[in-house]
Amino acid sequence: LIPEFVKAFGKSIQKGNNFVLKVCPMCEGQKTFEFVGTGGLWKCESCTNGDVYDIASLRSRLSETELYAGLAIPEPEKPSGLIEVASYVPPPERNRIPTGFTALDRTLNGLGRGGLTVVTGKTAGGKSTFTGQLALNAIQAGENVCFYSGELSSALFQNWIFSQAAGAQYMKPITTEFGRTDFAVDAEAEKYIRTWLKNRLYLYDNTDTKIISQNDIISKFEEAHRFYGCNYFVIDNLMTAKTAAAGDRDFWRAQANFTNEVKAFTNHHDVITILVAHPKKGNDGESYEDISGASEISNFATNVIGVRKFDDFDKDKMKTDADGTITVTKNREYGEVGKFDIRFDKATRRLAGYTDEVTEYDWIKEW
């Protein structure tokens, strides 16, 4: 501590190990203060504090702040990563984003910022249909969206999204050369849809490279957030992103690690991310434990949603006139879970709850 006293109060005389200072840190008067040798004897010529023989005695007479201020020693830095709960004031919550499904929004209270939602369900069970609508409803709410689709080409993705955005009124039936009845977006409506989506929906073009790694997806999302102001992200799906894993065990561990990185990205930027994951073989995604791979995938999620579209051979199809179900199997914020019947419209490729009104997106206002 000798050098700190000298630095703080100004050395006037040094005789061997004895220092005579201009200012006494005990009384702060312009008096002589002497530190004698290395034995720890503190002496002041005039103040009433008396002699202090060790640092413990000095600490007992001065507050921690006074001690560090007097010695010109910086106070210890507070440990990072620890929050005093009583004093913590959380930032005001930004607006939550609706999913567009009334029963689902009531259960989840919409989707909150910084939350990772995992969507699961069987192949051809409606997951991509569902996430496409989530993206459009986010755009309707004013968000810019970035989408990674590992299974749909850019052309097919665009066709799918345009159909969902159009709605039944602006879809016209066409007959293919093979006699199949299909549906196409009205050409005039398509112009308005393009204008509405311009600078608001971005797709990671998977035709640009043959193999897309998990790191590539995070990197592109970072760029989309920085350059295009995207705050809503969709990964469809987890299985299509390449990992460097050699075996099954390493593969599932890599998937869990990637999910953790997606969660970290979501938290850091305070955005919303939707991650599509397949269920375990033989399961339908109606339990959060059904997600294929490491258990951490569902553990990292804020919400887990199962999407199920009935096929003609589904035994549950015989019990209801619904076309499928949406099941909330995990709801970290509110704890409420539930299952809701849904309808599916083939022409528009839209899902809807039984009580939901038909959504008209804002491009129609410009019609």
Question: Where are the predicted features?
Answer:
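N-terminal structured subdomain of primase-like DNA metabolism proteins
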Residues: 1-76
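Short, well-ordered beta-strand core segments
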Residues: 145, 273, 304-306
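The Walker A/P-loop phosphate-binding site
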Residues: 77-169, 191
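Flexible beta-alpha connector loops of hexameric P-loop NTPases
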Residues: 208-211, 243-256, 285-289
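Conserved inter-motif catalytic segment of the P-loop NTP-binding fold
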Residues: 143-247
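C-terminal regions of RecA-like/P-loop NTPase motor modules
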Residues: 194, 215-230, 247-249, 264-269, ...
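Hydrophobic alpha-helical membrane-association signature
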Residues: 217, 254-261
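Structural recognition of the conserved hydrophobic beta-strand(s) that form the central parallel beta-sheet
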Residues: 234-235, 271-278
